[in-house]
Amino acid sequence: MKVILRSDVENLGRLGDIVTVKSGYGRNYLLPQGLAMLVTPGNMKVFELEFKKLQERMNDIRSKADELAKRISGLIVTVLMRAGDNDKLYGSVTTSIIGHALAEQGIDIDRRRILLDAPIRTLGQHTVRVRLHADVIAEFIVNVASEEKLYDDTPDRTETEESTKELQEEHAE
């Protein structure tokens, strides 16, 4: 089945490409989603008329992806995880965990766009890539820190009780 792509489709082609796909993929996914249209003489004329509009829309999406990439690149996102000896994590840092950490910083990205070569299973800094558009990939750093070490840095209970008593005495005077 030959179709004309109405938008960029990952692992298939770009806007305006005429590609051959299996019938089921075309009928059940590309055509209902509006990502493609059948190649017929009538559809070719219709596509030529709407090509400029589609091209402008794709350029807008690309420019928004570029702006978001500028915001993301150089960003350091901290993720707290439980870790055992030798800085090994109990479990691993997943794309959904990274997505939630980005959302906390005001950047909303679908977890499926976050690219991990392998699961993150150790503490430290790791470089993570995000595919924002077919042509735009941004990189940022995920700092995986241990929850236990953060709790160990808190002052002892006796120290906090002493400082609380001192503050109460100052206010009583």
Curated annotation (Swiss-Prot):
PROSITE patterns given in the database record: RIBOSOMAL_L9
UniProt keyword Ribosomal protein, yes or no: yes
Pfam family, one: Ribosomal_L9_N
GO cellular component: ribonucleoprotein complex; ribosome
One of the GO BP terms on file: translation
Highest taxon, organism lineage: Bacteria
Primary role: Binds to the 23S rRNA.
Protein name stated in the entry: Large ribosomal subunit protein bL9
